[in-house]
Amino acid sequence: SDSSIQEVVIMSGAQLGKTEALLNVIGYHIDNDPSPILVLQPTLEMAQAFSKDRVAAGLLNSTPCLKEKVRDPRARDSGNTTLHKIFPGGAISIVGANSPSGLASRPIRVVLCDEVDRYPASAGSEGDPIQLARKRSATFWNRKIILVSTPTNKDASRIEEAFERSDQRRYY
C-alpha cells in the first residue's frame, strides 16, 4: 500500500506461494481499496482455470467478506462472468497474455502478472503483453504492477530481467 512503490518483482522457486501472494492482493483490493484489477495469466485457458479454481472456488467462496461483495456469475443480472468480476468500486479482469483484446481499452490501477516466463513474446501482433498491461495503468498515480514467476532459462527470462532492474531485495 506504499504509493511510492509502483512495481514489485517476485522471482522465486516453484510452488512457494507466489500466486497465493497475488490472491492476497486481489482480496485486499476487493475489501479495502477497491480498484480496477487486471490479472494476466500465460494463456486464456490458464486464465479461465485460475478464475474458476483459485479466485472463485478458493478466494471468494472461502472468504465471507469477499463473497458478499462479488456476486456469483450465475446470479441473475450480476454482470459477472468467469473472466470479469465486478465489485463495489472496482472490477477484476482475468486475461491471457496471448489475447490482445484482453489487454486493450480499459484503465487498470492494479496489474498482476503471474508466471511471466511462460508468456508469449507478443500478444498476437500487438507486442509484449507485459508492456501492454503496463500501459493500462499509466494514468494512475498510485498504480501497482506486480510481476511473479519461477525463472526459466538464464539470460532469456522475463522475471530475471525484471529482477535485475529492481533493487533486488531479498527476504529470508
Regions found by a protein language model. Give the residues of each.
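Phosphate/NTP-binding elements of NTP-utilizing enzymes
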Residues: 1-172
